[in-house]
Amino acid sequence: MLVVCASISVHAASPINCAKITNETERTVCGKPSLLQADARMTTYFEIATQLVAMGQRGDLQDSQQAFPALRNKCGTDKACILAAYKKQTAPLEAVIANVVTHGPF
């Protein structure tokens, strides 16, 4: 079992704040529990993954995460498109975590 304790950097991975919706895509995410769950999963995986990689790769992950809202927002209110965007963004983060679990740095 892997236990990860990490200080969390929220500047690049803040989840959607449903009290401060700024566009129709965020409104769609906030109105659909499965999309909110996808947002929370992506944010959590980002926070963990950035603590497990070297600085160069961390910067790449941060750049990708900062660009994500603009890509997601191109979906408008299309729930399937939004979910696909979250899955595409989350996949490399999951891969980082899986790689550490199977190969370690330990």
Which residue ranges define each predicted feature?
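N-terminal alpha-helical modules
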Residues: 10-106
